Amino acid sequence: MIIGVPKEVKDHESRVGVTPAGVKALVEAGHKVLVETKAGELSAMPDDEYQSAGAEIVGSAYDVWRLADMVVKVKEPVEKEYGHFREGLVLFTYLHLAPVPELTAKLLDKKVVGIAYETIRDKAGTLPLLTPMSEVAGRMSVQVGAAYLEKEKGGRGVLLGGVPGVPPGNVCVIGGGIVGINAAKVAMGMGAKVTIVDLNLNRLRELDDIFNGRVYTLASNSYNVTHAVREADLVIGGVLIPGAAAPKIVTKAMVSKMKKGAVIVDVAIDQGGCIETARPTTHSDPAYVVDGVVHYCVTNMPAAVPNTSTLALTNATFPYVMRLAKMGAKAAIESDSGLRDGVNTYDGVLTCKPVADSQGRPWKAVGDLL
C-alpha cells in the first residue's frame, strides 16, 4: 500500500500523522510512504529523519494526496483540502464531523472511506485514539487557564495555588473523563481547590477514591453547575459523547453570573463545546471575552506541544495504520469491530449514528455495506 503523510494546514497545527519510526516499520513491511516536505518539522522530526527511515519526501500536498491509497493525518481536513478527496481514498485522522456538516457532505460526495480516530473503540469499549490527546489537552487546560487568569491576559489576577495567608483559586472541571481527571491532577498539583462535576455517580465515586477525597465531587444538574461555575476562577469543559455534538452543560445565563475575569477553557470545542458561549478559536487568536469572562476555545490545543503530542498520538494510532496497510481497509474493517466503529463515511454513505443524529442525516451501519 502507498501511505501518504501530508503536512497539516490547520492554523498552527504542528503535529504529524506518522513518525520516522512508523515509516521505518511500514517500509520494512513492504509498504511505500510518501511524506510531504517539512510535514514533521514542527514536531522536531525533520525530513532527513524520514528519508533515513525509508520515506520518499514529496514536494507538494497535491502529490501526496493524489498518489496515496491511504492518507494519515492528525486533524480534520480544512476547506482547501477538500479538493484532494476522491473515490476510494482511505482517510485516517480525527474527523469530528458532528459540528462540520460541509466536511461530511464532501466526504460523502467523493465516496471517501473516512475513519475517525475519535470513534474507534477497543475491546474494553474505550476510545484508545482519543485518550492520548485528551490527556494532553486536559493537562494543558490548567496551564492555559492559569496563564489567562493573569491580569495581563484579561484575567482576575488570581494565582491558582494561592500563597500562605491567601486562599487558592477555585477550579471547576465539567466532566470526569480523561480530560477531567488530567485537568484535576494538574490543578491539584498547582495547589488549587478542585471540583469535578459529572452525571455518573459511579464515576464520581471512582474519582473520590483516585484522589483520596482531595477533590470535591458534584452530581451534575443545573442547580449544582450554576453554583459551581459562579464560585470558580477557572472552568474546564471536558464533556464528551463519542462522535456526537457535545451537550451544552454551562448556559449563557450561568456564564453571566461568573466572576468578572474568570476563565473558561472548553476542551470539548472540537465537538461543538459544552459551554454555550464557547465558539472555536485558533492558536493565532485563542481567546475572547463574554460577560467579562475570558474564553479559550482552541480546537487543536495539543498542537502547542507537538513533539509530546505527536509521540503520544502515534503510539496509539500506529497499530491501526499498520493493520489497514497490511490488510487493506475493507478486510481490516471487517475483521475488527472496534475499527468498524471508527468508520464515519463509506462509499458515499454516512456510517456513524451520532454524526447522523447531530446533522439530521440518514445513516447505515458499515457492516451492512461491506
Segments (PLM) and residue ranges:
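Glycine/serine-rich phosphate-binding loop and adjoining beta1-alpha1 elements at the start
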Residues: 2, 8, 77-170, 298-300
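An N-terminal-biased, well-structured beta-alpha scaffold segment characteristic
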Residues: 2-106, 110
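Glycine-rich phosphate/diphosphate-binding loop of Rossmann-like nucleotide-binding domains
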Residues: 6-45, 152-240
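Generic hydrophobic/aromatic pocket-lining and core-packing "Φ" positions
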Residues: 23, 47, 104, 142, ...
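Short glycine-/small-residue-rich Rossmann-like dinucleotide-binding loops
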Residues: 69, 75-76, 95-96, 221, ...
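Adenosine-phosphate binding glycine-rich loop
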Residues: 118-159, 269, 274-370
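Rossmann-like adenosine-cofactor binding region
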Residues: 209-291
